[in-house]
Amino acid sequence: IPVCPRGSVRCQVSLPDLFDRAVMLSHYIHSLSSDMFHEFNKQYALGRGFIPRAINSCHTSSISTPEDKDQAQQTHHEVLMDLILGLLRSWNDPLDHLASEVHSLPKAPSALLTKATEVKEENQRLLEGIEKIVDQVHPGAKENKAYSVWSGLPSLQTTDEDARLFAFYNLFRCLRRDSHKIDSYLKLLKCRIVYNNNC
């Protein structure tokens, strides 16, 4: 995804190709998200007791998702599509701010800055790709535009250093968690829709 040459009007990419691109992109986003979490953890979070404070504190916790792979297998593909779209949209705003605020970290590693910007851009590309998939799988379907609103910007900008580092830690942790869910659901959908569960 970018799916079509710029300016092309009647460009139609096949569903298997759209899924291939989306799965590659979601896998890459999850890989970048994991890298960022580990880099942040190593440099800023060790010994600060963030783990017990972070339980159930993602802004997307209100989006009810399957508990495990078995539950995901039992979930209708339209529901999984809506979950993916909801999660991706829920990250647009926080990723924007993460990319612009991460430079304020003391001695922010350049790799962290680069990856934060890249994840922001790739998340938007993936969202556009999933919207194209939905158009092909359910043409004319009324799309669910629901997503979770993030209100964590003041925490990323607070002068309380411990609270600020925890806000970054939690955002990286939740991003890693949600990018893994998106990647898993997409792979499951690709298997189900493109290969008729023969994979």
UniProtKB/Swiss-Prot annotation:
GO molecular function list: hormone activity; prolactin receptor binding
Cellular component, GO, one term: extracellular space
GO biological processes: female pregnancy; lactation; positive regulation of cell population proliferation; positive regulation of lactation; positive regulation of receptor signaling pathway via JAK-STAT; response to nutrient levels
Pfam family of the protein (one): Hormone_1
Disulfide bonds listed in the record: C4-C11, C58-C174, C191-C199
InterPro entries hit by this protein: 4_helix_cytokine-like_core, Somatotropin/Prolactin, Somatotropin_CS
Gene3D superfamilies (UniProt xref): 1.20.1250.10
Keywords tagged on the record: Disulfide bond, Hormone, Lactation, Phosphoprotein, Secreted
This protein's record includes keyword Disulfide bond: yes
Phosphoserine modified-residue sites: S26, S34, S90
Localisation: Secreted
Function in brief: Prolactin acts primarily on the mammary gland by promoting lactation.
Similarity comment text for this entry: Belongs to the somatotropin/prolactin family.
Record note on quaternary structure: Interacts with PRLR.
Protein name listed in UniProt: Prolactin
Organism: Loxodonta africana
